[in-house]
């Protein structure tokens, strides 16, 4: 009965039927490729001075696409993925990753991690401060949290509702949530800046039209994962230079997403 309730709550936060489309798109789609470059670059920096055997955990690893980027960025460490949904973990298992199926509020780990990643997960959950606070307990002394979230309330649309987002964040809002959860923010910046005008226009037009039904929203959201030849490569090329500024810890002026590095106070 408790397991059934936990799964029902998890489904309120995320629709596991999306995993199939994600698994087919993540390695090629420009958005996921750009996000993985940012995550991989920062993960490599954050673990560069650690002795071999350091531990990295991705919470909400889904199909394992980001795990692969973390494994490439942290070749001297042990990278583990954790997710509640078996539907996503089945895809991650095919990649040969180290995996654990567990609830993020009850992680089965007796050791701390030098880096914990939470990538576009916390916006799905009702109590973001509680989640961030719980994850702080998984960090080894001096360990870092690396987190990404969707940015900008002005970009809210049917897409957010279809994928069960509860919020999009402003940079100051994410910094405040991290502070409430007991972290000191080391770096925080919007990213995906080059595509912001395109996304803003699409969302504005979507809000101006007839609200789609739930079924239409789901189909439209799945369409966001479609890889369009030519356009996909162009947008990937446009986003590629951004990672160099993030590697230098520059703060970008705007974007459709936010990345943050924080450490437990």
Feature roles, as predicted:
Residues 1-119, 129-132, 225, 229-230, ...:
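Conserved N-terminal segment of class I S-adenosyl-L-methionine
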Residues 129-144:
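A short glycine-rich, Lys/Arg-flanked "PGG" loop and its adjoining helix->strand segment in the class I
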């Amino acid at each position: 009965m408790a397991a059934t309730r936990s799964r029902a709550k998890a489904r309120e936060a995320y629709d596991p039927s999306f995993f199939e489309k994600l698994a087919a798109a993540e390695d090629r789609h420009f958005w996921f490729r750009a996000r993985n470059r940012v995550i991989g670059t920062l993960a490599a920096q954050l673990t560069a001075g650690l002795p071999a055997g350091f531990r990295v955990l991705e919470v909400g690893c889904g199909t394992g696409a980001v795990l692969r980027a973390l494994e490439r960025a942290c070749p001297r460490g042990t990278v583990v993925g954790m997710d509640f949904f078996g539907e996503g973990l089945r895809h991650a298992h095919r990649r040969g990753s180290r995996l654990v199926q567990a609830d993020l509020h009850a992680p089965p780990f007796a050791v701390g991690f030098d880096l914990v990643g939470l990538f576009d997960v916390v916006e799905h959950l009702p109590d973001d401060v509680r989640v961030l606070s719980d994850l702080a307990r998984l960090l080894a002394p001096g360990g870092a949290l690396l987190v990404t979230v969707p940015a900008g309330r002005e970009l809210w649309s049917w897409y957010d509702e279809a994928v069960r987002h509860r919020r999009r964040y402003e940079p100051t809002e994410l910094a405040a949530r991290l502070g409430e959860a007991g972290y000191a923010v080391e770096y925080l910046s919007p990213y995906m800046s080059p595509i912001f005008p395109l996304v803003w226009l699409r969302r504005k037009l979507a809000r101006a039209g007839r609200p789609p039904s739930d079924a239409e929203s789901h189909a439209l959201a799945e369409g966001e994962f479609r890889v369009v030849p030519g356009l996909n490569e162009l947008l990937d090329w446009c986003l590629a230079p951004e990672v160099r500024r993030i590697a230098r810890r520059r703060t970008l002026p705007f974007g459709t997403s936010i990345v943050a590095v924080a450490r437990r106070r």
